[in-house]
């Protein structure tokens, strides 16, 4: 016995008494009715071998077979034995009388009641001799057990007798007199209670108090009364012997925490209370089934009918939303079975022909879709379970894509489908990151197949709207999680012999990139259509400026282009041999699946046994593999030529790299990576979106995705790739048109003209990233600052893009790439900006917030050094060098050298002041003024013009006199300072005179 005083409620728990009553009745029936004695071993002995440990993590104790049933309670050796039935009966009667004196509860067919609730009739009925029949062994025992507050706690404590009662106990139906197992009864009661819950919204789950907590708090309601099932109510109407039990049930309070339902209450209130009671009863049963106890879960999974009934909860009408009370009931049971009895539960799942349909029918319930992903994630490479093949055969991917239809599915449903597919792609990444990862599989392979990609492209172009947004997110996730640069097996170094093709191979994205490249002009048209749509209403921002909203469609299209550009820079996308190997492996993989299907068909036909031995599909497959091995080995090792796919790229080039010969060579049978860059070059998308960059100065997401595109172009390969031509189009769009061979520049008849305007009419004809983007952005932001005292929102990304241009010009010899690029970078405007304006901006952005500078700590680390406003004096009276105030810009010392002099407070305040945008703006303004003045002076000097100055203005002279008159007082107050200044001026004058004399002397 435990001496722990808390967490126990032995006075109000009647579990042991109910068990004693049940086994007493069972013992009497066994003694009287031989048929019952035959049924007992069948129920209690047909179990798997049980271990001797009390923990149910191991197999429970073994029950003996034959004529005796061993007990698992305490130190008892047997629950009942046929050899000493009478002795056991007397012992049980003695224990029963002791329990009756302590708790004053002895009824065999109802729960315990308090001493004050019993009347003389109850006591006489309880103590009178009982004629035991099969009707006494009814469902009242299991019903009384369900209302016990300590039921779940006792099960969690692994009360073996209680577990045996739940899992192996039975009773006799009063109508049919047939035996009903307690587990079967609980499952049926669960389904009955669920069917009585008419609406999912009538019960607020957030306000539903836990059953155990409510029973412990409700001290006034301790009587064991339960919600009767319809079957039990009909049985009690027919059975007069149980009238006392029925009387006590009517007298008690609600068994599941409901208030007393008076006969005078309205029908609506009664229905609501009944519905809440049904829900609570279903919750209790689901809690029993979801306990992590081997015996309970084993009893469920070994019976197919139990699992079918539990699974049918998903098809209930009220299982229709995230807030439905049936969702947690269904998930608690099934998740526990998946966790504790995975093999048996997955065997059941594989028998469900409508598994995918059942799940997708509730795709808007995120908890259920998470459970769906958990089931799929059990099929790993090292331990396959066949679930992926199951959902693949049930067309999971194609059914998910069918939801991406604006006419048939609302936006929220499409978003849920997109989230599910993105989660599926995440756990199927080619580089596993956690335990839930399952690696590439047939599902993601189907999603990246040419058929699925064609459907996705069609959805984006024709559906647009919510379907476009969701589909773009799916494609972006597919590219990010299947980057071939992180493949665990390099496709270029594999052969069919060393790495036979399988559905677990890395996903090849070449088909995806080629399809999107061919439709890139259609995606650009989406941007143009929205730009030219006059029906889009204008919005007004906080600055009262009218603007056309960017919209999600344009943003998602450009985000897709940025991700496709990432994809085009992958290693496999720039190899012709990789595409050739991928196609060959796909062909062999499809042949293997056909051979496997043929083998399965042959095994099902007994008449073809001899034919199978002579022409074994396995041998045919091996023969094909041998032939294919030879071909693939040649592809991988000898690099043999195939006209269907072309040779590997020619890495020879001339100087400068950008020329017509190189352009024609790259455009002739390009790699899939270069194909995308060529289409991006010909459609002139980059210059258009950079124009939209400036017209939407406050959309930071838009700026970020465009900066990503520009950064990729400048950091891409400049040799053996079409990326260098993209760089040329950024610096000089006009010069780049000579290499756009796919665009007809002039055609009088108008035939063969592309959907885009000819070059002469193109508004971006003279686009240059230096003048038309960076410098223009600076100028617009400068004007805006003069008006609003704040910069435009894109200035941060403008500076980053300018830094990329400067880095590119220093990293490469641009004259070897294209002389046109060098000419642009050598212009006077750009040189002044990059050396002066950008340098000042860089210095301002690198300053520490709060002032200070960076110093070297002596170990090669650059750390911040804040200015110190104190001066530490050395013993000789001099100020320490460590506390001198240094001007971070000039490097000169503004501190004092002697202890008797004052600190320059103005210099100190300048150091302590924050570096703000205002400081930078003022510096830039001074620089621009000086720059403009220098330009004017230089031109005047060249033209021989001398500026003598404007004539004197009387008004200005009077203003100057007034100003001088007003400042007399302050000048008189500062005589000492003026004298000091005069002395300094005199000293300087004398020094200058000495210098002049020295010069004259020389």
UniProtKB/Swiss-Prot annotation:
**For bias kind Acidic residues, which ranges apply?**
220-241, 262-273, 635-645, 991-1002
Name positions with the PTM Phosphoserine: 58, 255
Q: Does the keyword Lyase apply?
A: no
Protein keywords: Cell cycle, Cytoplasm, Phosphoprotein
- Annotated localization: Cytoplasm
Q: Where is the composition biased (Polar residues)?
A: 868-885
Sequence positions bearing Phosphothreonine = 613, 618
Q: What is its main location?
A: cytoplasm
Q: Where is the composition biased (Basic and acidic residues)?
A: 62-97, 609-626
What biological-process terms (Gene Ontology) are attached? Answer: G1/S transition of mitotic cell cycle; negative regulation of potassium ion export across plasma membrane; regulation of signal transduction
Summarize subunit and interaction data from the UniProt record for this chain.
Answer: Associates with the SIT4 protein phosphatase catalytic subunit in a cell-cycle-dependent manner.
Q: Give the UniProt family note.
A: Belongs to the SAPS family.
Other noteworthy facts: Present with 5960 molecules/cell in log phase SD medium.
Describe the function of this protein.
Positive regulator of protein phosphatase SIT4. Involved in directing expression of TOR-repressed genes and in dephosphorylation of NPR1 in response to nutrient starvation. Negatively modulates K(+) efflux of the cell by the Na(+)-K(+)/H(+) antiporter NHA1.
**What is this protein's record name?**
SIT4-associating protein SAP155
Highest classification ranks of the organism:
Eukaryota, Fungi, Dikarya, Ascomycota, Saccharomycotina
């Amino acid at each position: 016995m435990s001496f722990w005083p808390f967490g126990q409620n032995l006075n109000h728990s009647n579990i042991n008494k109910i068990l004693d009553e049940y086994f007493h009745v069972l013992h009497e029936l066994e003694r009287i009715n031989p048929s019952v004695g035959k049924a007992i071993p069948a129920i209690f002995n047909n179990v798997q071998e049980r271990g001797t440990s009390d923990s149910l993590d191991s197999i429970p104790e073994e029950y003996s077979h034959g004529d005796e049933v061993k007990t698992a309670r305490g130190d008892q050796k047997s629950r009942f034995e046929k050899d000493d039935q009478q002795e056991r009966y007397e012992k049980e009667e003695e224990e029963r009388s002791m329990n009756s004196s302590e708790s004053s509860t002895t009824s065999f067919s109802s729960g315990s009641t308090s001493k004050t609730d019993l009347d003389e009739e109850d006591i006489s009925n309880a103590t009178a001799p009982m004629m035991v029949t099969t009707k006494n062994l009814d469902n009242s025992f299991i019903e009384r057990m369900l209302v016990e507050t300590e039921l779940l706690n006792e099960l969690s404590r692994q009360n073996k007798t209680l577990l045996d009662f739940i899992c192996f106990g039975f009773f006799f139906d009063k109508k049919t007199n047939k035996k009903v197992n307690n587990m079967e009864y609980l499952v049926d009661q669960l389904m009955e209670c669920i069917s009585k819950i008419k609406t999912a919204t009538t019960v607020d789950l957030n306000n539903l108090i836990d059953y155990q907590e409510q029973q412990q708090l409700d001290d006034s309601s301790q009587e064991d009364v339960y919600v009767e099932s319809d079957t039990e109510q009909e049985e009690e109407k027919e059975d007069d012997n149980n009238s006392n039990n029925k009387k006590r049930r009517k007298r008690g309070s609600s068994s599941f925490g409901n208030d007393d339902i008076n006969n005078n209450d309205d029908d609506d209130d009664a229905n609501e209370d009944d519905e809440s009671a049904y829900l609570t009863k279903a919750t209790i049963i689901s809690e029993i089934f979801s306990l992590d106890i081997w015996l309970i879960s084993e009893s469920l999974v070994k019976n197919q009918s139990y699992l079918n009934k539990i699974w049918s909860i998903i098809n209930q009408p009220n299982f229709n939303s995230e807030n439905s009370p049936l969702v947690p009931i269904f998930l608690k049971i099934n998740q526990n079975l998946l966790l504790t009895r995975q093999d048996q539960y997955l065997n059941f799942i594989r028998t469900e022909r409508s598994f995918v349909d059942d799940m997708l029918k509730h795709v808007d319930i995120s908890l259920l879709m998470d459970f769906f992903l958990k089931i799929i994630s059990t099929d790993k490479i090292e331990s396959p379970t066949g679930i992926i093949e199951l959902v693949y055969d049930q067309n999971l991917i194609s059914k998910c894509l069918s939801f991406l239809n604006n006419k048939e599915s609302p936006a929220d449903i499409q978003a849920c489908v997109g989230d599910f597919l993105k989660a599926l792609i995440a756990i199927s990444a080619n580089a596993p990151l956690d335990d839930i990862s399952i690696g590439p599989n047939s599902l993601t392979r189907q999603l990246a197949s040419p058929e699925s990609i064609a459907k996705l492209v069609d959805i984006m172009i024709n559906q647009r709207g919510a379907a476009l947004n969701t589909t773009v997110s799916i494609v972006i996730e597919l590219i990010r999680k299947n980057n071939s640069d992180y493949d665990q097996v390099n496709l270029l170094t594999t052969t069919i012999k060393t790495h036979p093709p399988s559905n677990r191979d890395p996903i090849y994205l070449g088909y995806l990139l080629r399809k999107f490249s061919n439709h890139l002009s259609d995606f650009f048209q989406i941007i143009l259509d929205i730009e030219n749509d006059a029906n889009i209403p204008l919005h007004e921002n906080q600055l009262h400026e009218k603007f056309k909203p960017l919209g999600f469609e344009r943003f998602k299209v450009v985000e897709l282009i940025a991700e496709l550009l990432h994809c085009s820079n992958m290693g496999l996308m720039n190899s012709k041999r990789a595409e050739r190997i991928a196609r060959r492996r796909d062909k062999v993989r499809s042949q293997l699946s056909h051979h496997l299907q043929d083998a399965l068909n042959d095994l099902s036909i007994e008449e073809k046994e001899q034919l199978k031995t002579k022409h074994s599909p396995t041998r045919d497959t091996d023969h094909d593999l041998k032939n294919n091995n030879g071909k693939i080995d040649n592809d991988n090792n000898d690099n043999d030529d195939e006209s269907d796919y072309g040779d590997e790229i020619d890495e020879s080039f001339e100087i400068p790299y950008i020329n017509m010969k190189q352009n024609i060579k790259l455009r002739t049978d390009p790699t899939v990576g270069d194909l995308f860059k060529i289409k991006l070059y010909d459609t002139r998308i980059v210059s258009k979106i950079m124009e939209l960059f400036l017209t939407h100065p406050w959309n930071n997401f838009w700026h970020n995705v465009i900066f990503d595109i520009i950064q990729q172009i400048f950091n891409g390969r400049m040799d053996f790739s079409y990326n260098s031509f993209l760089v040329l189009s950024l610096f000089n769009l006009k010069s780049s048109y000579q290499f756009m061979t796919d665009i007809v520049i002039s055609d009088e008849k108008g035939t063969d003209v592309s959907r885009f305007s000819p070059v002469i009419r193109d508004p971006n004809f003279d686009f240059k990233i230096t003048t038309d983007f960076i410098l223009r952005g600076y100028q617009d932001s400068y004007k805006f600052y003069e008006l609003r005292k704040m910069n435009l929102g894109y200035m941060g990304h403008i500076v980053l893009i300018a830094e990329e241009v400067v880095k590119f010009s220093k990293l490469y010899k641009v004259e070897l790439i294209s002389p046109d690029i060098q000419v642009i970078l050598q212009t006077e405007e750009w040189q002044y900006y990059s050396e002066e304006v950008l340098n000042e901006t860089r210095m301002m952005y690198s300053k520490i917030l709060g002032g200070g500078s960076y110093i070297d700590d002596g170990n090669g680390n650059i750390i911040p050094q804040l200015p110190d406003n104190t001066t530490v004096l050395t013993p000789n009276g001099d100020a320490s060098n460590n506390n001198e105030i240094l001007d971070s810009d000039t490097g000169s010392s503004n501190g004092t050298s002697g202890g008797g002099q004052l600190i320059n407070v103005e210099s100190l305040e300048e150091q302590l002041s924050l570096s703000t945008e205002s400081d930078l703006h003022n510096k830039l303004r001074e620089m621009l003024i000086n720059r403009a003045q220098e330009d004017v002076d230089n031109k005047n000097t060249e033209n021989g013009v001398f500026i003598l100055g404007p004539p004197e203005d009387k008004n200005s002279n009077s203003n100057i006199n007034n100003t001088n008159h007003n400042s007399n007082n302050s000048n008189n107050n500062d005589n000492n300072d003026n004298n000091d200044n005069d002395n300094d001026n005199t000293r300087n004058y004398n020094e200058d005179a000495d210098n002049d004399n020295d010069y004259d002397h020389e």
